[in-house]
Amino acid sequence: MLKLWKVVRPARQLELHRLILLLIAFSLGSMGFLAYYVSTSPKAKEPLPLPLGDCSSSGAAGGPGPVRPPVPPRPPRPPETARTEPVVLVFVESAYSQLGQEIVAILESSRFRYSTELAPGRGDMPTLTDHTRGRYVLVIYENLLKYVNLDAWSRELLDRYCVEYGVGIIGFFRAHEHSLLSAQLKGFPLFLHSNLGLRDYQVNPTAPLLHLTRPSRLEPGPLPGDDWTIFQSNHRTYEPVLLGSLRPAEPPVPGPVARRARLPTVVQDLGVHDGIQRVLFGHGLSFWLHKLVFRDAGGYLTGKGLLWDLDRYILVDIDDIFVGKEGTRMKVADVEALLTTQNKLRTLVPNFTFNLGFSGKFYHTGTEEEDAGDDMLLNHRREFWWFPHMWSHMQPHLFHNRSVLADQMRLNKQFALEHGIPTDLGYAVAPHHSGVYPIHTQLYEAWKSVWGIQVTSTEEYPHLRPARYRRGFIHNGIMVLPRQTCGLFTHTIFYNEYPGGSRELDRSIRGGELFLTVLLNPISIFMTHLSNYGNDRLGLYTFESLVRFLQCWTSLRLQTLPPVPLGRKYFDLFPQERSPLWQNPCDDKRHKDIWSKEKTCDRLPKFLIVGPQKTGTTAIHFFLSLHPAVTSSFPSPSTFEEIQFFNGPNYHKGIDWYMDFFPVPSNASTDFLFEKSATYFDSEVVPRRGAALLPRAKIITVLTNPADRAYSWYQHQRAHGDPVALNYTFYQVITASSQDPPALRSLQNRCLVPGYYSTHLQRWLTYYPSGQLLIVDGQELRTNPAASMEIIQKFLGITPFLNYTRTLRFDEDKGFWCQGLEGGKTRCLGKSKGRKYPDMDAESRLFLTDFFRNHNLELSKLLSRLGQPVPSWLREELQHSSSG
């Protein structure tokens, strides 16, 4: 019996183990099936979010307030913009203060020029005038108390400037825990009550500064924070702009003020008290309505000089039509809702039309219901605008062959023709903005040949973030407009699952980022996706709510234009953006990800020889090319061997064209690529363009006596048969007057202007740090080139070090230094170099010595500040000037 039990017991244990394993397997299978069912089954739909309703005036909802009939005093004259630069002076507490950054962000978004200064202490007020012209059109104080408590000398200086030039002041009072609860503002008939909790905000409809702001609505509910300041005054110079009420738990404000009274948190000083107009804020810019009024304040105080008109153009793109996985696409009901909302929006925004971007390959790749939605879109195709993506939604930068890229486009065009989709809008968008910026030349060429594209848009120029820096440009005849995001992406399809919660989306619409995008940009192209119009239809919710909110709170005139007229409108407003500013794609990870892997930033030069002309730059180019670690650009067949990329029409050909002039270095860390274009030095645009594309490049310039340089250029032009140089003496050229022929004045400028050395160097130093700039003594280069080349090699950090004392040899016949060869032979520059000219006449020498005296003095001061040695020729000129 015992033996039998020993046999049966293990068998029962084995069966128990098997049963447990089967139960575990069954549980896992059930969980997997449930997960699959949940993921593939349609979600139980919650009610769709309803857009913001119509505005309703709530002025009667609050109690009495201090809003009184506007006083018609004599207002101070508007800013004399003809006598002031359109620059805003912003006094900040620190470079990192939050309010200061918010002020700057709004100015930058509005494309206004500004200068920030740390709020001065005693006697360090920045210079406010330049001769008889004011430097600033508006003054902003992040901390109003810094203005009020200025020392007497600085305060009088600033106030006198504001009165004389009609300049206004915006100031912010931010209460903190140590602020007095009640106090009079020093020197003003104005009382402040601080650290209050407020509610129920309202706009005073009689405030003179209102332009963008529409005073038709009360904002109910508590205002954020408990650190609000309200203003009180009986003086007629103060007009309330924004008003709120005390929260029930707040103690009453001193004075005869009703409990439910409207209390001013923003006041406008009409200038009756002291002749200076001001707008004072009792809080920062964290509350959205303050941003709106801040823009109005800046516009009013500058006579609308810092204010766009009320027109705002919006275009809503719906990318990825027919693209998307099952369960995220539009169904028939969604298309019907799209049409209904479009019609509603047209009553609010003239000509509003959704702009649909399609990839035909994915037509009918959804569920049966979603395929019916595709058909519904095509049935109503004439009611929308349409633009092409790529046929297979591929990124264009992956196509290196233009014909293959064009074939993909033709497939999409054939699909459009077969289904009656209009193809004449002249607009296209590349998937993921690939190839638009950084430029993929093949994309632009294929777009033009297949579709006749005239305009596109991208969020990547010059960078994705911050969005306020996005700009437009024109390349290869195609207008590239800035594109904006609206917080809706392919994965944001459910209201209650919005990242950060649905309140984040509503906050963006109601005074947040999306609202400010339209407020601060005359033209906004918004990117949305097909999936945003299925499911919870967040695209419809967002834009209907946005439009209604804008019309509640602003006087903006919302409009829609087709892409090509919209592009023309954009560049009419911002003609300065027509020319692009190329940047290094490898300095931005997003740019590198959408840039062809066949391209490399290693082909960009490490240093530039920038001129000026006739100073010895060709000799340096020749000498450097003898170094085994240094490689020059290939010669250009069209611009006298120099590339001349940064200062002429070649710049618009793009960086692919530029990089084709350089080989791929065998070792990017030790090989030095460079180019020499002597016309770069005195160009107004080259330093900015160069620093954008080559921010770490070293810059080499060669300076000789500017009088000798001018004479050399004149003789150079005579040698090349310039009729002006042949028909006029050098003295006639350099002394030409404004009444002389334009051709003569042009030659005069090319002789004289490059010699304004300090002016041009200051421009370079605006964009490059002084440590990246080397100034070579042109006279020493001529007499002792080996010493100059030693300095240049050390500056560039080139290894191995080449001994130019052994490499170079003076050629008596040529009269300058050449490469020494075996057998006593030399290899020299071409016949055009080293020409012998007659000596300059004494009259011209005397004139030029006097003409360049101040320029040379400024150059000496600049070199002293930079810690760079003074060239031998400059010392001689300064000694000669002082002795004369």
Curated annotation (Swiss-Prot):
One of its GO terms (molecular function) is hydrolase activity. Residues 1-18 are cytoplasmic. Disulfide bonds join C818-C828. 3'-phosphoadenylyl sulfate binds at K614, T615, G616, T617, T618, S712, K833, G834, R835, K836, Y837. It is a single-pass type II membrane protein. Residues 599-884 are annotated as: Heparan sulfate N-sulfotransferase 2. The chain crosses the membrane at residues 19-39. Residues 66-79 have a biased composition (Pro residues). It catalyses: alpha-D-glucosaminyl-[heparan sulfate](n) + 3'-phosphoadenylyl sulfate = N-sulfo-alpha-D-glucosaminyl-[heparan sulfate](n) + adenosine 3',5'-bisphosphate + 2 H(+). Residues 41-598 are annotated as: Heparan sulfate N-deacetylase 2. The keyword Magnesium does not apply. Residues 49-82 are annotated as: Disordered. It comes from the Eukaryota. Keywords: Disulfide bond, Glycoprotein, Golgi apparatus, Hydrolase, Membrane, Multifunctional enzyme, Signal-anchor, Transferase, Transmembrane, Transmembrane helix. Monomer. Essential bifunctional enzyme that catalyzes both the N-deacetylation and the N-sulfation of glucosamine (GlcNAc) of the glycosaminoglycan in heparan sulfate. Modifies the GlcNAc-GlcA disaccharide repeating sugar backbone to make N-sulfated heparosan, a prerequisite substrate for later modifications in heparin biosynthesis. Plays a role in determining the extent and pattern of sulfation of heparan sulfate. Required for the exosomal release of SDCBP, CD63 and syndecan. This is Bifunctional heparan sulfate N-deacetylase/N-sulfotransferase 2. It comes from Bos taurus (Bovine). The gene is NDST2.
